[in-house]
């Protein structure tokens, strides 16, 4: 996919040396949360962070873990003017034995690297970043809340720091990782969401950057989201020429009887740059394929087709999928002034498949089910 991009940096300069890591423990630790049930996503941060500087001339510098602190970059830094920035979202979990676990960190690093390439930020050795993240998790292990649904959210980020207003590949960059303790997305059980499908605004398009985790993809979605909220909707169901793409910041899944009468779990395909390759998305596809109980399809489908299927009673469930919630059940979609209701099991506040997927993935994340997807942090 990236063959058409010119490789600008030598391989030797793309290596982060974990053995050179410098650890400076903070002398002013934060006051840690006292009630984990009151944690709010992204509002409190752990004591330490990772930083690694990069320059075109020298490559990656010495990695460092130190106390959480503000960054110092010039006001002309490329990231501030041209959005040369990419990031990841992943979590560290603490199992019932107190062991720290990461969920498929290799997949996050694959996407992180692909995002960096897309905007000409420096390449890096993925394994080294995972090792640095593990060391941060061990150092800040007391910040990982115990219990199902609780975790330490990790935010690897890579920004261009070149001191220039010219539009082009940056000759300097900074990678950093911060961490935030978080609670369950649905602390009191699933809460189905109401969507509005509106083609007035477009999140991504073929050949664009929607398949990469760039900050520039998120800023334009805020206004449509606020407009949707004013109308009483939880999220926007993003369309592209009537084709269903994503829901809010999540991948979209529909479980239905398709037009051929087959029971099918369907999600929009990757490949044209429109859909973000979600780690949870991939996990759901692989997990349900292992079950072998119904057809699994990555295929484009339109909102018109979905509305018709709902009217005909062929839709069993629909849900969004992502790191924050794992799955988010959908109870209705507003489309062209008409409301389309999707079945919800009142006893579960979601559909049976949605619940089963959530339970299955969470069991892996917390080490209850043995899987190589769950990586123990030594």
Swiss-Prot record:
GO cellular component labels: mitochondrion
GO molecular function: branched-chain-amino-acid transaminase activity; L-isoleucine-2-oxoglutarate transaminase activity; L-leucine-2-oxoglutarate transaminase activity; L-valine-2-oxoglutarate transaminase activity
Range of residues in the leader sequence: none
Transmembrane segments: none
The keyword Amino-acid biosynthesis belongs to this UniProt entry's keyword annotation: yes
EC primary class: transferase
Keywords of the record: Amino-acid biosynthesis, Aminotransferase, Branched-chain amino acid biosynthesis, Pyridoxal phosphate, Transferase
Cross-referenced InterPro entries: Aminotrans_IV, Aminotrans_IV_CS, Aminotransferase-like, B_amino_transII, BCAT-like_C, BCAT-like_N, BCAT_family
The name this protein goes by in its record: Branched-chain-amino-acid aminotransferase
Organism: Dictyostelium discoideum (Social amoeba)
Lineage: Eukaryota, Amoebozoa, Evosea, Eumycetozoa, Dictyostelia
């Amino acid at each position: 996919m990236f063959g058409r991009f010119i490789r600008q940096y030598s391989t030797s300069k793309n290596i982060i040396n974990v053995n050179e890591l410098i650890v400076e423990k903070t002398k002013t630790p934060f006051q840690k949360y006292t009630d984990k049930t009151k944690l709010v996503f992204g509002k409190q941060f752990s004591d330490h962070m990772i930083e690694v500087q990069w320059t075109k001339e020298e490559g990656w510098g010495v990695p460092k873990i130190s106390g959480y602190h503000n960054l110092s970059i010039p006001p002309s830094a490329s990231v501030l003017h041209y959005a040369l920035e990419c990031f990841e979202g992943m979590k560290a979990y603490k199992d019932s034995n107190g062991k720290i676990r990461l969920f498929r960190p290799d997949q996050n690093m694959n996407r992180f690297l692909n995002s960096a390439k897309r905007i000409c930020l420096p390449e890096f050795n993925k394994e080294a970043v995972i090792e640095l993240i593990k060391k941060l998790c061990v150092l800040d292990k007391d910040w990982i809340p115990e219990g199902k649904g609780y975790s330490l959210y990790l935010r690897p980020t890579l920004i261009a720091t070149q001191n220039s207003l010219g539009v082009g590949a940056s000759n300097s960059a900074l990678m950093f990782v911060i961490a935030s303790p978080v609670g369950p997305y649905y602390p009191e059980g699933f809460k189905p969401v109401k969507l509005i499908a509106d083609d007035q605004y477009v999140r991504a398009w073929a050949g664009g950057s929607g398949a990469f985790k760039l900050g520039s993809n998120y800023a334009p979605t805020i206004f449509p989201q606020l407009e949707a909220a004013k109308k009483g909707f939880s999220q926007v169901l993003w369309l592209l020429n009537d084709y269903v793409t994503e829901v809010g910041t999540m991948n979209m899944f529909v479980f239905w009887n398709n037009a051929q009468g087959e029971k099918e779990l369907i999600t929009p395909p990757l490949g044209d740059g429109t859909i973000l390759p979600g780690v949870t998305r991939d996990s759901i596809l692989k997990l349900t394929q292992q079950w072998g109980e119904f057809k699994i399809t990555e295929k484009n489908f339109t909102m018109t087709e979905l509305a018709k299927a709902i009217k005909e009673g062929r839709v069993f469930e629909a849900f969004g999928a992502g790191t924050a919630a794992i799955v988010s059940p959908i109870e209705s979609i507003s489309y062209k002034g008409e409301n389309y209701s999707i079945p919800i099991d009142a006893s579960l506040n979601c559909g049976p498949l949605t619940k089963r997927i959530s339970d299955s993935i969470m069991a892996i994340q917390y080490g209850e089910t043995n899987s190589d997807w769950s990586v123990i942090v030594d």
